[in-house]
Amino acid sequence: MIAMKNIIIITGASSGIGQEFALQIDTAFSNIDEIWMIARREERLMEVGKVMEHKVKMISMDVTDEYAMDDFEELLEKEDVTVRMLLNAAGFGLMGPFDELSLEEQTDMLYVNCEALTKMTYICLPYMAKGSRIIQMASAAAFVPQQDFSVYAATKAYVLSFSRALNQELCDYGLYVTAVCPGPVNTEFFQIAEQYGSTLEIKKLTMITSEQCVSEALYASYRKKDMVIPGIPMKAFAMLTKIVPQGLILKIAKMMKK
């Protein structure tokens, strides 16, 4: 009888945090047969795959494409795999006043950050076994509403709530879900996000590296934590949101933008 392949699936694997997950997992996990890397940009996927030691399956697809997701589900069944870890790192954000960003761009955020993440989790769950892990990229933006980041912050609040609830549903079966809630991370995220608005300078002062973010995320997953907040500044911010009323935080943030 042929043993099932143990795999790790990473969405958004061609750049940023997703790419860093791929690189760190490649060196840290020896009992994995394949790493499946998913992203739209095939050329970028190939660049990452070239430097990895594990066998890599590069899947160029748009996670918001329903037909592509159907094909991916069929691939899972065909390959006879056990998903040892799912990392939902695909996502993006745009800054700016709600009425100045296009409706298409903002609904795209909903599709990528919420709907696609939910679908990918649902599709992969039947192929998981006791000890499998799910890591969902949320954000410190999930802790409080944010002016000029309204839709993005709302999508990440969904990811955080969904992930922590799902962890409670699955932990009795030996499956664990970790929501990762970083503040600013030194990736190309902000190059895209700042097309229509600028980031508060105080946020940039709290920026951490993708290496630190991913390292803390993997360690939290190993420890079966349902949430991790990488970086000391964001841990302090999270504590602040529990003490200070959200209305006051919103007023202070608004004054700082003037």
Model-found features: residue ranges?
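Conserved glycine-rich cofactor-binding loop
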Residues: 14-15
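C-terminal helical subdomain
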Residues: 179, 200-237
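Active-site helix of classical SDR
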Residues: 121, 155
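Conserved NAD(P)H cofactor-binding loop of Rossmann-fold oxidoreductase domains
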Residues: 89-94
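Residue(s) in the substrate-gating loop at a strand-loop-helix junction
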Residues: 139
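Conserved glycine-rich Rossmann-like NAD(P)H-binding loop of the short-chain dehydrogenase/reductase
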Residues: 29-47
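Substrate-binding pocket helix/loop in short-chain dehydrogenase/reductase
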Residues: 97-98, 102-110
